[in-house]
Structures are given as C-alpha cells and as structure tokens.
C-alpha cells in the first residue's frame, strides 16, 4: 500500500501536518485536484481528516510531500495521527519519495 504525508516544518508552533492518508492502493497514479485518494484519512493538525492547504501566517514556508511504499496495509483507524502512522510504518517501508515546495501567502 501507499501512505502520503504533507507537512510544514516552518510553522511557528512546530511541524504542522496538513495531510495524512494511508492504505492508498499502489495502483494509484495520480490524485486529481480537489479530490482525496482512495485510502484511509488520518488526522491533520487542525484535528480534522482530509487535506488542509497551505496558509502560512507570514514568510515563506516549506511544504513536504512524503510518499511511502509499504509492504502491507496498515491496521489503523481513520483519524490516526502522523506520529502513530510513522510508528506503524516502521519495518514496512519499501521506498520513499519526497517533494518540497515553497509557499508564501500573497498580500
């Protein structure tokens, strides 16, 4: 299965988790704009499931998209935190890809 995490390590309160999704089918080739991939939604730093886009309070922030290929599906419930996901993935990561983008609020 696949797992996807998006976070912002430059948030004033520490790393802010924008998106946590796991048990994504490995056949997934893309995620269309405005959609969520098939899989189980974890909890972001707003305390909700699903994607929360970038909206930094000030300055330029780095946003990391981390995609993990796993050797199994994870037995975790919807709303799982990134910390619990990372713990469950230990020993199951086959490969990892990472993309970083910068974003600054306009105005």
Tell where the protein language model's regions lie, with residue ranges:
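N-terminus-centered regions that define maturation/targeting leaders and the start
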Residues: 1-107
């Amino acid at each position: 299965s696949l797992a996807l995490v998006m976070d912002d390590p430059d948030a004033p309160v520490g790393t802010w988790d924008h998106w946590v999704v796991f048990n994504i089918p490995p056949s997934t080739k893309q995620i269309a704009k405005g959609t969520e991939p098939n899989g189980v939604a974890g909890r972001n730093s707003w305390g909700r499931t699903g994607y929360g886009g970038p909206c930094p309070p000030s300055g330029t922030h780095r946003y990391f998209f981390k995609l993990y290929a796993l050797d199994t599906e994870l037995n975790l419930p919807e709303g799982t935190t990134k910390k619990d996901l990372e713990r469950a993935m230990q020993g199951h990561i086959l490969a990892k890809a990472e993309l970083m983008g910068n974003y600054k609020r306009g105005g």
